[in-house]
């Protein structure tokens, strides 16, 4: 319903691709179309006191960076917000910003928490949650899809995985929604800092409670596991609980809200979903490609390397733009069309390589459950107010999407 102004390629030298305001208030499709065609490995010059950085926009080049563990690292941060401001304080502790042997060891520990038994339990609860939210929305007739539907689906799933007490879940939702994004351009940055630290403090207390216990949830796994005979450091335990909570809640929430908006804006695809003309697994992949809940990934070059003819020097900050790679014309037919029957669908929504999203299966389950529930229970969707986009340079989604929903 809202129409954001489009940024022209002629303005490329004036804009800052690390700006949350830019991503919230403007459409950048023409910018990335230009970059893919003419400047696929682009150097954004320093802006005021902010360092310059590389912008990688083509699918093939994004793939190359993701695979290259020899020349690129996440240990200084995996997003521009941290890479350009001195690095990530969780470096070497949280899986997403750890490389090498320790990354492999911690990933193996966390993988045990995503067991088939646990995921089967979550899948059953997940569909019940989705159906309940949709039925409640249908009874009211109008709702905010972002707040009344999308917010509770991934929150419930990741909290089930971590066995977060139900009484604490809304509190954590309020924190995660402000840890990496804000609802307003002028929201003080201290809000984000406070939210992140409150999440860490919460998990510090929960880990202490579960140390020495026999529960099988992910928090207990981190609290009690050993690697080469030694327990994880307290910082590793807290940082990985934090990473699971943020990754499991934020990205799923934005993917679901974006999917609902896409179905409203593309009535032919809504009909295809309702009529059973598309496979739900295939539709899930297109929803994930289209919504791009994470705009980019970040790396720092550890050595000189050439990407698509451009020399990247050791120490340079590199950003790989999932939002652009997922619309690459050389990989996807009609990439600017939302097509639930699209196959193959080689999107980068869950990244790639050694840092491929550990919770990818859970994320797919969430979107699948929403599509399934919409197909079975909902007759029509209509947007009745302007959507409100979040302010973030890493996350892409809405904090509000008012809709009318009928059976």
Swiss-Prot record:
Heme binds at residue 357. Keywords: Heme, Iron, Metal-binding, Monooxygenase, Oxidoreductase. It comes from the Bacteria. SUPFAM superfamilies: Cytochrome P450. GO terms for molecular function: cholest-4-en-3-one 26-monooxygenase activity; heme binding; iron ion binding; monooxygenase activity; steroid hydroxylase activity. Its cofactor is heme. Coiled coil: none annotated. InterPro entries: Cyt_P450, Cyt_P450_B, Cyt_P450_sf. It is an enzyme of class 1 (oxidoreductase). Belongs to the cytochrome P450 family. Together with NovH, involved in the formation of a beta-OH-Tyr intermediate in the novobiocin biosynthesis pathway, an aminocoumarin family antibiotic that targets bacterial DNA gyrases. Acts as a cytochrome P450-type monooxygenase with specificity for the tyrosyl-S-NovH acyl enzyme (L-Tyr-S-NovH) to form the beta-OH-Tyr intermediate (L-beta-OH-Tyr-S-NovH). This is Cytochrome P450 NovI. The gene is novI.
